[in-house]
Amino acid sequence: MKLQAVMETLQRQQRARLQQELEARQLQQDSSEGRTPPSAGYPGNGSDEAEPEALKIQRAQAAALAAMRAAAAGLSQQPSPAASEEEDGESMASDEEDEKERDGESERYQDMASEEEDLKGKWDEDDFEDEGEDEYEDMEEGIGVNEAGRVGKGSTLPPKHSSQQAFPSQRSQGAERAGLPLSGHPQLQDHGDWTYEEQFKQLYELDGDPKRKEFLDDLFSFMQKRGTPVNRIPIMAKQVLDLYMLYVLVTEKGGLVEVINKKLWREITKGLNLPTSITSAAFTLRTQYMKYLYPYECEKRGLSNPNELQAAIDSNRREGRRQSFGGTLFTYSPSGAPSMLSSPKLQVSGLSLGGAALNGSTLSSMQKIKKEEDSPISLAMPPRIPVTLAGHSMVAAQVAAQAAALEQLREKLESGEPPEKKMALGSEEQQRIIQRTIQHNLLAMTAQLPMNIRINSQAEGRQDSAVNLTTNGTNSISMSVELNGIVYTGVLFAQPPTSASGTSKGSSNRTGSIGGGSSNSQAAPPSTPSAPNSNNPSP
C-alpha cells in the first residue's frame, strides 16, 4: 500500500510537470509566430485563466503531500474529495501515459531522483526524501500546505518563500535524524567506556579526603610503570572496593603480613563498611590487596617482602589443617569396643614396649613424662626407636601409645604427686598397660583394619628386640617378638573386659645364634594357657 501511494503521488507530480511544460511550450510557440496571446489584450481574463491553473497545481501538490503522509504513517487514507475528482479527471485524460508508466517501472524508478530534485527547485513543499519521516516533520509540512491554501488568489509566491525558509531547517532535521543511526555504534562503544570511567569516578568520589586523589593517581601511575596497569576496579558486595581505605587500614595494622598472621581481616571488613556476612571476605580482601596494592606497599612502605608473605600464607594454611586434624585423630572407636576419651596430648621422651619376662630377663625402660603449661601437648616417639608401619598401622600405634599415656597421666594425677617426680614405671605396670592397650585399642581396630606392626628397640643393655603384630581375624592377634636374634611367636586371644589378666595361647619358635652357634627350640603346646609374653623357651 505504501509503495502504491508513493507511485500515485509521483505520477500526479509528473502530470503536473508535463502540463506546465506544455503550457510553456505553447506560449513560446505563440510568441515565436508573432501572434498575440489570448491573454495579452485581456489582462483580467488572462489572470483569471492563470489563477485556476495555479490553484490546480497547488491542489495537486496538497494531495501529493497528504498521500505521502498517509503512506509514511502506514495509513490507508483517501485524499480530499477535490483532489480525488481532479485525479479522476486527469487519470481519464492520461490513460495512455499510465499504461506506459506501468509497463516501464524500471525507467520510472530511475527518473524518480531527478524528478524530485526538479520539483524541489520549483515547489519546496514537496520534500520527499524517504517514507519514514516522523510525525513532527509531517506536521510542519501540513502547516505549510494549509498556509499556502489560505493565501488565496494571486499569492503563490509568499507561501513559496515561506517554504523556502522552512526547508533548510527541515533538511537539517532530516540530516540529524539520518545521522542518528550512524552515530549509534560509537555511542554504544562510548557507553562501555563510560561505565569503566564511571567506576574510576566513583572510586575518586567515595569521600572528600584530599589525599585520596593523590594516592589513586600515584597508585595507577606506579602500576602502569610496573607493567601491570589497573584495567578494572574490583567489585565487592555490589559496590566499588575502596582501594584507598583498604590500603590505609592494612598499613595501619602493620602491613599485609601482620594482618594475615594476627587475623585482623574482620576489623578491616568493618573499617570498609562491608557486611560481615560476606562469604570468604578475608580471602577476597587478601587476594585483591595482593593484586592491586601489595606491590605498592612493598615499594612505598617496605613493611614486608614476598617471601615473608608466602611464609605467612603457608603458616596460616598449616594452622588451619592442624586444627581440623587434631580434633579427629584420636576419636576412632569401632562398634562394640569401649570408646576412648579425647584429652590433652602428652609429650613423651622415651617409650618402649617391654616389661615381659623373656628367657628369665626383664626388658624395662625409663619413661619420662613432662607436662607443659598452657600449651598443646603432643605425643612423640624417641628417635632411637625406628617404627615401620603399613597402611593404617600408624594410626593404631598412635592410638595405643595415646591410651598408655592417658592411663599413666590419670594414675599420676590421682596420686597427687607431680609427674616429674615419678621417672620410671615397674614392669608389672607396663605389662598391664600394654595388655590393656592391645586388648581395648589395637584389637578393636584390627577387627576392621589389617595391620602389621614391627617395632625395633635397643635397650640400655644392648639387647635388640622386635615386635610383630598380625591379625588373624576378629578375636586373635599373632605376635612375634625378636630379641637378640631370637624370634618368639604366639597368638593373643580376646579376653572379656571383666578379667584382670590376659590369656595367650600359641607357640614360640626361637631361631638365633649365640656365641657363633645356633639353636632351635619348640615351646609348650598351644592348648596350655599361660600369661602373656611368658613363654620361656628352653635353652
Swiss-Prot record:
InterPro entries: ARI3A/B/C, ARID_dom, ARID_dom_sf, REKLES_domain. It is found in: Nucleus; Cytoplasm. GO terms for biological process: regulation of transcription by RNA polymerase II. Residues 209-301 form the ARID domain. The keyword Transferase does not apply. Residues 161-173, 497-512 have a biased composition (Polar residues). Residues 1-190, 497-539 are annotated as: Disordered. Residues 495-502 are annotated as: Important for cytoplasmic localization. Residues 55-73, 519-539 have a biased composition (Low complexity). Its main location: nucleus. Pfam families: ARID. Homodimer. Transcription factor required for smad1 and smad2-mediated responses to TGFbeta during mesoderm induction. This is AT-rich interactive domain-containing protein 3A. The gene is arid3a.
